[in-house]
């Protein structure tokens, strides 16, 4: 009886594997003969612009500014700035952009700019929570600092890290409610 069950199970497995193989070959070799354009947007930007999905649209950012667009291409908001190396962080409906090795960071939501933080030390990393609070790793001569900023860009707290003490942070992350820093 056990050998009969084993044979039936083996046959079923072989049939399933064969079906998966045949379907994957058909999909891989399918030749599309036409397409339909459902929407298009003209891009009139510089080559250094980068795009990233955000909320129910996308964000375009570069050294000169950041803009939020709906998927239809309609501009919702636009903010100019001057950054050498902009880096973005997204969490839910909040986005932060900071000038890496610079000293400014901006916080936005789907309605526009919420806050701006100016630092006295170079920014190494930026993270944002869903509520718009920002955490930044800052570089000093003998230490690094992890600063938390509220939605308006005001510093909430600062944690000093040294190589001989806690070590330098390689990466940070904050929870969506900004209550946990890792």
Task: State the predicted function of each range.
Residues 7-24:
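Hydrophobic membrane-insertion alpha-helices, especially the h-region
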Residues 142-182:
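Extracytoplasmic/periplasmic C-terminal soluble domains
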Residues 50-101:
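Extracytoplasmic/periplasmic/luminal assembly and interaction segments
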Residues 44-53, 82-93, 121-132, 166-173:
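Repeated scaffold domains used in trafficking and secretory/extracellular systems
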Residues 58, 95, 134-135, 178-181:
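Hydrophobic beta-strand positions that form the internal "hydrophobic ladder"
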Residues 65-67, 103-106, 142-148:
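Structural motif
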Residues 1-5:
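N-terminal Lys/Arg-rich, disordered targeting/topogenic segments
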Residues 31-44, 73-80, 112-118, 155-163:
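A short beta-strand motif characteristic of beta-propeller blades
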């Amino acid at each position: 009886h056990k050998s009969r069950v084993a044979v039936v199970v083996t046959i079923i497995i072989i049939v399933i594997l064969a079906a998966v193989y045949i379907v994957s070959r058909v999909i891989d070799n399918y030749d599309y003969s036409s397409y339909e354009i459902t929407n298009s947007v003209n891009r009139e930007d510089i080559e250094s612009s980068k795009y990233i999905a955000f909320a129910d649209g996308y964000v375009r950012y570069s050294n000169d500014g950041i803009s939020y667009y709906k998927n239809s291409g309609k501009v919702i908001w636009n903010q100019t700035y001057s950054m050498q190396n902009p880096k973005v962080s997204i969490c839910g409906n909040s986005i932060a952009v900071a000038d890496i090795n610079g000293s400014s960071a901006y916080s936005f939501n789907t309605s526009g700019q919420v806050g701006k933080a100016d630092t006295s030390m170079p920014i190494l990393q930026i993270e944002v929570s869903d509520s718009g609070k920002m955490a930044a790793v800052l570089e000093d001569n003998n230490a690094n600092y992890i600063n938390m900023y509220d939605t308006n860009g005001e510093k909430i707290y600062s944690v000093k890290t040294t190589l001989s003490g806690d070590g330098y942070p390689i990466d940070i992350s904050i929870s969506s409610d900004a209550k946990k820093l890792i």
